[in-house]
Amino acid sequence: MGWFYYIARLVVKFILFSVTRWKVEGKANIPRQGPLLIVANHLNLADPPVVSVSLNRTAMFMAKEELFRSKFSNYFIRSFGAFPVHRGRLDRQALRQAENVLNEGMALVMFPESKRSPNAQLQAGLPGSALIAVHSCAPILPIGISGTEKMRGPFWILRRPRITVNIGRPFQLPTVGLRANRTELTGLTSLIMQHIAELLPVEFQGNYAKQGKTDAIEN
């Protein structure tokens, strides 16, 4: 990461401390080294930088391709450790890049819902995160974000919203082999989303509030 990354982190932290009530829980659960697939729910465009400054290690991000179209946003987002992914189809190049990040022992952040939740409820996850986890065998670190959905409109700063980043324990998916079929990937994706749901307030869990405890293997 270049100098801009570290300056941007300082700026984001300053903003969060100044205009929000930002709290990070479970920071001790973050492995300090080795490959790590970080998955979180998605409420606001601010979620990637909020997650980044909540971690105690450098992480790369997958971000929608549309954010890279202007020169300024392309420079800013890439400087913050992001690379593009095309939504709505299987982006093999992005998947390969994600696997390379993990194979090099780095951390990668994904938002399995693929887009921001329109009502703060946890939406169904897409299978990309499960596919990457299966191919890389990387441990998964779930994160539940609440409060960033209030960072909207011209006057949200005056409310100083309470933002909580709740970090769970890393876990491994059950072994299914590299050629997991669609049914297996759907089940693994559901496991990932359940881990995220358990870190959210009940009113944010959506359909996953009705599901039982996860049976993945905790590290």
Where are the language model's segments positioned?
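Membrane-interface helix-loop junction between the first two transmembrane segments
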Residues: 23-33
